[in-house]
Amino acid sequence: MTTHHSAETASTPHPHGFATKPRAMTSERTRIKICGLTREQDVDAAVAAGADAVGFVLYAPSPRAVTPERAAQLARRLPPFVTPVLLFVNESATNIAAASAMVAGAIVQFHGDETPADCLLATGHGLRPFLRA
């Protein structure tokens, strides 16, 4: 009798000790974010190249910085399935909430010394999706 092992039944190990979906049955896809865009033609090129997300830097000291108003203007060029990402560095929760309200569907990315509590406060306790870099 021959025993056959199939990749369809092999579980992928999980770092917390339990198995995830079988390897052959999952489809992995890398999402691409292009960040630091400041011009319409760059946003259009990122979308044409297949970017899944486009980032706008709202940190004034950065050479790639844009204002919240400019980020909103550029984000309006994005098609429905390209996600706008607003990048902040040590910004106040009030300013993050105000800027986020200007860009429909935006995800917030924290790139400073923000604590988990700071991230939750600035995103309405997680009502707006966020990333911590």
Language-model-derived ranges and their functions:
Residues T2, K21-A133:
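Conserved N-terminal beta1-alpha1 strand-loop-helix module at the mouth
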Residues M1-T2, S11-P13:
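Intrinsic low-complexity/disordered segments
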Residues P13-H16, A24:
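Short, linear, compositionally biased motifs with a strong N-terminal bias
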